[in-house]
Swiss-Prot record:
One annotated GO biological process: L-histidine biosynthetic process
Molecular-function GO term, any one: imidazoleglycerol-phosphate dehydratase activity
Protein name per its UniProtKB record: Imidazoleglycerol-phosphate dehydratase
Top-tier EC class: lyase
Pathway: Amino-acid biosynthesis; L-histidine biosynthesis; L-histidine from 5-phospho-alpha-D-ribose 1-diphosphate: step 6/9
Subcellular location as annotated: Cytoplasm
Catalyzed reactions per annotation: D-erythro-1-(imidazol-4-yl)glycerol 3-phosphate = 3-(imidazol-4-yl)-2-oxopropyl phosphate + H2O
Originating species: Prochlorococcus marinus (strain MIT 9301)
Pfam families named among the record's database cross-references: IGPD
InterPro entries: IGPD_sf (IPR038494), ImidazoleglycerolP_deHydtase (IPR000807), ImidazoleglycerP_deHydtase_CS (IPR020565), Ribosomal_Su5_D2-typ_SF (IPR020568)
UniProt-listed PANTHER family: IMIDAZOLEGLYCEROL-PHOSPHATE DEHYDRATASE (PTHR23133:SF2), IMIDAZOLEGLYCEROL-PHOSPHATE DEHYDRATASE HIS7 (PTHR23133)
Length: 201
């Protein structure tokens, strides 16, 4: 198992130009500029609470709307996580966390299984948080899941303020990802699967 669990992804299309660097064993240091301020704020949560070092730069057609950039950042970040995990030897694999933010409480449960699946249950009453379309939260996680190969369940326990709900979601996600990707010392570098392999399908 490599001592450096980090990766870099560059992805360029006619709509976006994105670079992502991640170090899974970092200190929560981040440099993020996607051109979408609220998305930047949420990505900082992933870095800070997951203790992942994260650098993300994105240039996209945000003069049209934020959809392409938001989705493509999710794609690139998912690919970066999958690449940094490699064969996923020695990881804890499963993660879960409840995160509160004032009146909001969100539960995230996930499995770095190589089997992409998203169950998403956030009830966001506001159509926008600032200038950010709240429909894009789900689109981000769809893109991430499909390119990281994780099974992800997001459940809103309670909450009324859309900003609080989304931020609690990202905080819970970051802590669950931290739990799942950390090294299990008792496993001695083996793959955490009775099949003997985990891969992104």
């Amino acid at each position: 198992m490599s001592s450096l669990r980090q990766s870099e992804i560059k992805r360029k299309t006619n709509e976006t130009d994105i670079s992502v660097f991640i170090n899974l064993d970092g200190n929560g240091i981040s440099e993020i500029d996607t051109g979408i301020p609220f998305l930047d704020h949420m990505l900082h949560q992933i870095s800070s609470h997951g203790l992942f070092d994260l650098k993300i730069r994105a240039i996209g057609d945000t003069h049209i709307d934020d959809h392409h950039t938001n989705e493509d950042v999710g794609i690139a970040l998912g690919k970066a996580f999958s690449k940094a995990l490699g064969e996923r030897k020695g990881i804890c694999r499963f993660g879960h966390f409840f995160a509160p933010l004032d009146e909001a409480l969100v539960q995230v449960t996930l499995d770095c299984s190589g089997r992409p699946h998203l169950s998403y249950d956030l009830q966001l009453k506001a159509p926008r948080i600032g200038n950010y379309d709240t429909e894009l939260v789900k689109e981000f996680f769809i893109a991430f899941v499909n390119n990281s190969g994780i099974t992800l369940h997001i459940n809103q326990i309670r909450g009324s303020n859309s900003h609080h709900i989304v931020e609690a979601c990202f905080k819970a996600f970051s802590r669950a990802m931290r739990m799942a990707t950390e090294i299990d010392l008792r496993r001695s570098g083996s793959i955490p699967s009775s099949k003997g392999m985990l891969e992104n399908q």
